């Protein structure tokens, strides 16, 4: 995994955790949780690609990995839409920058997961 991506995830998660969005803080906490889950999934998928010999054990151990992959893409799409929505409604420049960076990171991670999954298929 690219060290810039790791620091980007950590930076965005730290920034999001500092935001105070009033009644929508539960939604923000949900986004943070999904971001963390997405990072872990992307990392594990990347590790499986690095150990291409592990492909068969991945498929045997988890016969539903394609279903999980589909679910992760749905989560990414939801997060992208949620971040875009937040970006449209916020007037705070700190939040705008954070959400713009989060959106860029989500698009990069989506592409990485697609690349990893094609290598595993």
Swiss-Prot record:
Residue span of motif Nuclear export signal: 12-21, 85-94
Keyword tags: Host nucleus, Host-virus interaction, Transport, Virion
Keyword Ribosomal protein: no
InterPro entries: Flu_NS2 (IPR000968)
Cellular-component GO terms for this entry: host cell nucleus; virion component
Subcellular location: Virion; Host nucleus
Transport keyword on record: yes
SS bond list: none
GO biological process annotation, one example: exit of virus from host cell nucleus through nuclear pore
Top-level taxon of the source organism: Viruses
SUPFAM superfamilies xref list: Nonstructural protein ns2, Nep, M1-binding domain
Subunit details: Interacts with protein M1. May interact with host nucleoporin RAB/HRB and exportin XPO1/CRM1.
Family label: Belongs to the influenza viruses NEP family.
Extra remark beyond the main annotation: Average number present in a viral particle is estimated to be 130-200 molecules.
UniProt function note: Mediates the nuclear export of encapsidated genomic RNAs (ribonucleoproteins, RNPs). Acts as an adapter between viral RNPs complexes and the nuclear export machinery of the cell. Possesses no intrinsic RNA-binding activity, but includes a C-terminal M1-binding domain. This domain is believed to allow recognition of RNPs bound to the protein M1.
UniProt protein name: Nuclear export protein
Source species of the chain: Influenza A virus (strain A/Chicken/Hong Kong/FY150/2001 H5N1 genotype D)
């Amino acid at each position: 995994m690219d060290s810039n991506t790791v620091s980007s995830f950590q930076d965005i998660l730290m920034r999001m955790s500092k935001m105070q969005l009033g009644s929508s803080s539960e939604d923000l906490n949900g986004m943070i949780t999904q971001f963390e889950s997405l990072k872990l999934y992307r990392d594990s998928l990347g590790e499986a690609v690095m150990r291409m010999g592990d492909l068969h054990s991945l498929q045997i151990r988890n016969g539903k990995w394609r279903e999980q992959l589909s679910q992760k893409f749905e989560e990414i799409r939801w997060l992208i839409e949620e971040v875009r929505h937040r970006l449209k409604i916020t007037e705070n420049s700190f939040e705008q920058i954070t959400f713009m960076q989060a959106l860029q990171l989500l698009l990069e991670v989506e592409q990485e997961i697609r690349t990893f999954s094609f290598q595993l298929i």
